[in-house]
């Protein structure tokens, strides 16, 4: 079936929309994709929504600006789908399903609570197409971490490649997550630590620029290894998979341990970028076997400084091959959007989305809620 997958990640920079042909088991093809960037007003609304979400006690709570943000992003997701279809000279009648992740504003699996804002019924009524949404809730309610969700999609893609195993697929969004695939063994997955979020927030606070384009600011700075070691002492980095993070979990901790307020712009950016690489490398000793191949996707794949730091830190442990998703025929920018198209098709068939080795769920679990006209 033809599915449009939608993703608005923790970097909060925009909506990725991507077309995929899949039956929820095999991937027939990965189609075109686009990004609908958030304007400054929408991003500010989402930043405030993240703050207001701290008052959530139940997954239906919408304190502060959350209701307004939910309506706004739903309508923008509809716009993203229409733009993608227009680009391809298609209409909504040409697709079978939409996979709608929504925007994560609160993620506390220890409290069995995760909230992704987005109105599935409003989206299906706008587009006239069935919508699968709310992918994480069932896993979290059962005691799983609710993240990462994409490992089963990574497994379907990696099966088509001829790369030395184990293969690690690293997505560097606001939070970084990894899937480790080793032959026929169940996929192992977890969040590794901060991805782009801390770097983006630091740059924006200092310069009002939303991200470090091409890692140029970090490339001019000097990494403070002692401050990175302070952060790596946190118990999270010694905890084996599965494990997950909220976007803001390390914001205060890193700010205090690194003394970011006292660091210059370039050195702060360099040290935060190196921290992302270091937290990925810190996972390797916790795995049964070190990955021989790494495929990097997400915004981090567009940051040459981060990629160089990853190569240096991963290569210090074992000889590895690090490449970006684009080099294996995937879209580094749209991989998660493609994933949610795949997961939507999978959920429609009642197939498992998560596994004990990926989220800590007690058993393989399906998920998602289907919205129809």
Swiss-Prot record:
Pathway(s) the chain acts in: Amino-sugar metabolism; 1,6-anhydro-N-acetylmuramate degradation; Cell wall biogenesis; peptidoglycan recycling
UniProt keyword annotations, A-Z: ATP-binding, Carbohydrate metabolism, Kinase, Nucleotide-binding, Transferase
GO biological process: 1,6-anhydro-N-acetyl-beta-muramic acid catabolic process; amino sugar metabolic process; peptidoglycan turnover
Its EC number(s): 2.7.1.170
Record: residues binding ATP: 9-16
Pfam families on file: AnmK
Described purpose of this protein according to its UniProt entry: Catalyzes the specific phosphorylation of 1,6-anhydro-N-acetylmuramic acid (anhMurNAc) with the simultaneous cleavage of the 1,6-anhydro ring, generating MurNAc-6-P. Is required for the utilization of anhMurNAc either imported from the medium or derived from its own cell wall murein, and thus plays a role in cell wall recycling.
Protein name: Anhydro-N-acetylmuramic acid kinase
Native source organism of the sequence: Xanthobacter autotrophicus (strain ATCC BAA-1158 / Py2)
Lineage: Bacteria, Pseudomonadati, Pseudomonadota, Alphaproteobacteria, Hyphomicrobiales
């Amino acid at each position: 079936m033809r599915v449009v997958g939608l993703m608005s990640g923790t970097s909060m920079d925009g909506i990725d929309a991507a077309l995929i042909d899949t039956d929820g088991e095999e991937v027939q093809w990965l189609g075109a994709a686009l990004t609908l960037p958030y304007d400054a007003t929408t991003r500010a609304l989402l930043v405030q929504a993240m703050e207001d979400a701290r008052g959530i006690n139940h997954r239906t709570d919408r304190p502060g600006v959350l209701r307004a943000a939910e309506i706004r992003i739903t309508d923008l997701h509809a716009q993203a789908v229409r733009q993608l279809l227009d680009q391809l000279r298609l209409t909504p009648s040409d697709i079978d399903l939409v996979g709608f992740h929504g925007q994560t504003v609160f993620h506390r699996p220890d409290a069995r609570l995760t909230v992704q804002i987005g109105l599935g019924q409003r989206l299906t009524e706008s587009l006239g197409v069935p919508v699968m949404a709310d992918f994480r809730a069932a896993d979290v309610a059962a005691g799983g971490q609710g993240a990462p969700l994409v490992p089963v999609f990574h497994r379907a893609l990696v099966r088509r490649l001829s790369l030395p195993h184990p293969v690690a697929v690293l997505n560097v969004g606001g939070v970084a997550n990894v899937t480790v695939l080793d032959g026929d063994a169940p996929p192992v997955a977890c969040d590794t630590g901060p991805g782009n979020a801390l770097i983006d927030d630091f740059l924006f606070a200092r310069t009002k620029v939303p991200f470090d384009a091409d890692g140029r600011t970090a490339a001019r700075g000097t990494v403070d290894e002692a401050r990175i070691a302070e952060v790596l002492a946190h118990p999270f980095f010694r905890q084996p998979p599965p494990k997950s993070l909220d976007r803001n979990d390390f914001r205060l901790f890193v700010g205090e341990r690194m003394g970011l307020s006292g660091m210059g712009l370039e050195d702060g950016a360099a040290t935060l970028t190196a921290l992302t690489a270091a937290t990925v490398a810190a996972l390797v000793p916790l795995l049964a076997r070190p990955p021989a191949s790494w495929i990097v996707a997400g915004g981090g794949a567009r940051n040459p400084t981060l990629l160089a730091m990853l190569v240096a830190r991963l290569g210090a442990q074992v000889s590895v091959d690090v490449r970006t998703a684009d080099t294996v025929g995937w879209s580094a920018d749209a991989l998660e959007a493609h994933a949610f198209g795949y997961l939507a098709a999978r959920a429609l068939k009642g197939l498992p989305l998560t596994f004990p080795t990926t989220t800590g769920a007690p058993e393989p679990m399906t998920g998602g809620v289907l919205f129809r006209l």
